[in-house]
Amino acid sequence: MLFRSLVQFAVVAYMGWRWHNIAVDGIPYQWRCVPRLEVSAFGTDYVRVVFPEDTTQWKDDTPPEKGQQIYVYISRDTSGLMEIQGASASKPFVGGDYMQATVVSYQDGFVQFQVGFDRYRMAPELTDGIYNLQPDDSVIASIRMKRGEGVIEGIFVNGIPLENISNGAAMAKARQEKEAQTLFDRPHLVDTGMVPPKEE
């Protein structure tokens, strides 16, 4: 039992260190995404992030196999969004950006892939903003990439953090504004400039 707890702690600690390392030194990217609510094995809430742009041209002569690790070549377009430039069993030449992925399927020269950074942790009370998303909303994941691995720093809906469009965020903001109201800001029953008449 103790060994299992130590292993779980070590895994969580390593993931935390890896996330911090990539977040500090990684190259920033923006990628279109669709957030979904799920619950992890540890019982904490998180957002499952689906990336619709998950299919690209296969650059090699030998077709990939399902489950194989591949390298997806990436760049940025003029607006700063990530562009997928194809995939291969080999890393790109020096200077080329890429992300590691796993093959989901292959057909007619195109490979469907899945990346390893498909989760984004959020406080449970702030996740309900997902239900307010509209089909025409611009939903972007802010990502950092380093040596093929990535982490999601944030999810933005029309430029606003996903956390900020939740009912929980609205309630917290209203609570803060109410607490910030000082005694002097509150309405008084008697105006301080008025003096009650002297009784005789």
What are these regions (language model features)?
Residues 32-63:
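Short extracytoplasmic
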Residues 55-66, 79-85, 150-152:
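Short, Lys/Arg- and Gly-enriched loop/turn segments at beta-strand edges
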